[in-house]
Amino acid sequence: MNAVANAASFDDHKVADLSLAGWGRKEIAIAETEMPGLMAIREEYRAAQPLKGARIAGSLHMTIQTAVLIETLVALGAEVRWASCNIFSTQDHAAAAIAADGIPVFAYKGESLDDYWEYTHRILEWPGDVGPNMILDDGGDATLLVTLGARAEKDASLLANPTCEEEEVLFAAIRKRLAAKPGWYSRIQAGIKGVTEETTTGVHRLYEMQAKGRLPFPAINVNDSVTKSKFDNLYGCRESLVDGIKRATDVMIAGKIAVVLGYGDVGKGCAQSLRGLGATVWITEIDPICALQAAMEGYRVVTMDEACDKADIFVTATGNVGVITHDHMVKMKDQAIVCNIGHFDSEIEVAAMRQYTWENIKPQVDHIVLPNGRRIILLAEGRLVNLGCATGHPSFVMSNSFTNQTLAQIELFCHGAKYENKVYVLPKHLDEKVARLHLKKIGARLTELSDEQAAYIGVPKEGPYKPDHYRY
């Protein structure tokens, strides 16, 4: 079948180029061979169709791996509308392949902020003037749009004082929708059974909403499943960070001083990859436990004030705001590389650098010319470097994350009534199931407990093997 011809009468999408669909389909087929968890879930649940009746609004990087997730959700009965959760992260051939198969997708690499929020609205608009009943989120923007819009219907002052360019665009988009369709956000919010959240930043938003009594539906924190955070965040970043830096700059990493800001799971993976390629790695941390971990691994733990004029490569991985400041950047060495692997672009004070001359080298690579004549290299305008300058994490590790997402969607859609408006994590037995589904692919074989051994340590032979408080 000609995928592009198949999509000729289907216009509920916005992608860069539908003619890329064939290329995308070939890469999706390869990715499926590296995503055993998702393929096993398709096989296990296809007949039961547990997501039949689900209308899932998806806001997650529109990559080849995400295409496999989308098609898994559809195979289990769901209707899906999709947008990317980052303006630079879309792989256009992946989006084209999904659109060519008649699935509404709104994403292209290099979106404007206006388009970004327009597309996030589009995933909430379903034929027949109905909305989604599930959200699958990465970073929390789809959830934010629905909940902030509903609150602004009652208190317009919430949109009065944007603190950055992104908020200016978001608030304007909400005001426009409020004028055109009064009460629309509240109707959408009322129809949502639950949300599953992919990443650290989005989970932080959910817990904030819960603490303030503003979470209007149940949420599952996928990020803190062990098979997500200890694999995607650690091993995924260990491979995709240096892929992004090298594709963008062709720089030799060996011999350089690299600073990783933040030593959580993401920072740990970044530090390992940079050290593995021969860099001297320094760490900045606010948490004494993480700082001690870094020091015990042989990294030098410093402050940015100490490091800013000495290092060659800077990577933010904190999930915080303003960790690399204007004052840090103006002190940096000539040709210092600055990038971010946290979800949002707020970790680096990019806006403060707009006062200087910018020279675009190629897409997502800019020279910022400082008054002293030195130039620093900013990657992906401070957004996710591994997706802006490369293609993100490998398929295998994303299979772990997306298998969790699929199981979480099934759980909330099928059993949502038993959940309060709180944030939950998937139970340990499902975490272990996700891991088990991936062992055969990499040639790993489990040892089985004897009855005597299981009784001795007090666990079932089939698991779970660890208590919920166990730290892997």
Swiss-Prot record:
InterPro entries: Adenosylhomocyst_ase-like_sf, Adenosylhomocysteinase-like, Ado_hCys_hydrolase_NAD-bd, NAD(P)-bd_dom_sf, S-Ado-L-homoCys_hydrolase_CS. The keyword Hydrolase applies. Pathway: Amino-acid biosynthesis; L-homocysteine biosynthesis; L-homocysteine from S-adenosyl-L-homocysteine: step 1/1. Binds 1 NAD(+) per subunit. NAD(+) binds at residues 199-201, 233, 262-267, 285, 320, 341-343, 386. GO terms for cellular component: cytosol. PANTHER family: ADENOSYLHOMOCYSTEINASE (PTHR23420:SF0). This is Adenosylhomocysteinase. It comes from Methylococcus capsulatus (strain ATCC 33009 / NCIMB 11132 / Bath). The gene is ahcY.
